Amino acid sequence: MPNKGREMLKTDYVFQATEEPRELVRLQMLERIFDAGTQRRMLATGLTTGWHCLEVGAGAGSIVRWLEQRVGPSGKVVALDTNPRFLRGSSSSTIEIMQGDICDMELPLATFDLVHARYVMIHIAEYRKAFERMLRCVKPGGWVVIEEPDFQAARAVTGPEESRLSFGRVTDAIERMFTSLGMDYALGAQLPALFQEYDLSHLTVEHEGHLSAGGGMVAQLMKLSAEQLRDKYVATGKVTEADIEQYCRLADDPDAWAIYYATVAVTGWWQPQCSGPA
């Protein structure tokens, strides 16, 4: 099935220009670390056969393929991504791949039983507009599951002093990189209030600080990100090449512990002016 829509520019995805093989590795690492939690949250909504689901920012496609198995042939999964380069071959009678930006795509209104996005809104300066677009797609009585990072939580706990200082400077560079694009590097912390503001109810809020020793999955994920975004980090003026090297050494050191960031996940029920799910 051909991709639909047109590629938009509202989302300044910081990994857009990275080398395809390394970006696929990074996305697959995200899947290995976080898919189990994402799937648990989705199942808690009552996800079942016949549901129509929208996956915003489909990445390497693991959640899309998992949803296909859950909803079955009577259901529908729409996979939206600004660059669906890693979704080739995922189309089926159940899965529809769309290329575009959630802020501008003309998606069917009040259609989906479940809308999900993971690590998407942090890359969108107009994240409220993106959220509103998602809500417009949800059926009355449908569910929204959003998972976003909070880099404000990051800090080195143990390890050589030089590496810990460099870790702090890299975190400052991450903040500057996002804020220079009009984005919030701690967006995850804003999610619960955002869901309340838009009158979603029956909220479930989870906060997980990713404390990892060097060599752990999260540490290696952030090392790979630092290597891919090295030029962007240095361009902020907050770090040097040497700082990034020290950060990567700490991420490899099994005796060095750090909170690399936190993830906030919020699930909410969308039914304006109604008391709650049956």
State the predicted function of each range:
Residues 10-35:
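Class I SAM-dependent methyltransferase Rossmann-like catalytic core
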Residues 32-52, 66:
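Conserved alpha-helix/loop element of class I SAM-dependent methyltransferases that forms part
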Residues 54-105:
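Class I SAM-dependent methyltransferase SAM/SAH-binding core
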Residues 105-114:
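A short acidic, Gly/Pro-enriched loop at the edge of an enzyme's catalytic core
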Residues 113-128:
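A short SAM/SAH-binding and catalytic strip from SAM-dependent methyltransferases
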Residues 128-143:
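A short glycine-rich, Lys/Arg-flanked "PGG" loop and its adjoining helix->strand segment in the class I
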Residues 145-216, 231:
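Conserved catalytic/acceptor-binding region of the Class I
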Residues 184-186, 201-278:
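Conserved Class I S-adenosyl-L-methionine
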